[in-house]
Amino acid sequence: HNNLRVDLFSTELTTKSFLTQMESMSLDISDFFAWGYIRLFHCHLVEFKWTPDAMNDILERIITHVKFSNTDVAIIDSLTIFTEYTTNEAVLTFLTQAKNICDQGKTILITMHSYAFTDEVLTRVRSICDAHLLLMRKLMGDKYVMVLEVVKVRGARKTTGNLVSFEVHPGYGMKIIPVSVAKV
């Protein structure tokens, strides 16, 4: 693991649910969590007043923490809830600040739902980001599988076959579905 440090800001998971979910995919990260290599910051607070000012403050606190912490990777899951209570400009400013931090050597992964943005804002969001991965749920035969599409990776050549299909099996982990099977 080379002593990589990861901070996860989650609006959806508590510490217990995060560790349980990882363990259910045969990814036991409890030691990394216990030693502080992975830290979880739960952003969904009980009795918190969701207002534009509060959201802007949280976004500013997150970006300041990432900028000045000793973390190598920051994961924000999910930015969607913030878009409901703040302006598009605040979200775009947050993403621009995140990109500037990435240019200094840190990695920041942000999940968001595309339905939270207008097409115009979504185009601006995509232009700021270095990579854009689209996760979809597709029906293949009689079961649903997850499909990950690499839409954009800055600096990479566009290649064919930029789709990965997989299933998540509790207790086993992720099972990649071969392209020949996925296309049937």
Regions found by a protein language model. Give the residues of each.
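Phosphate-binding/switch region of NTP-binding enzymes
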Residues: 112-173
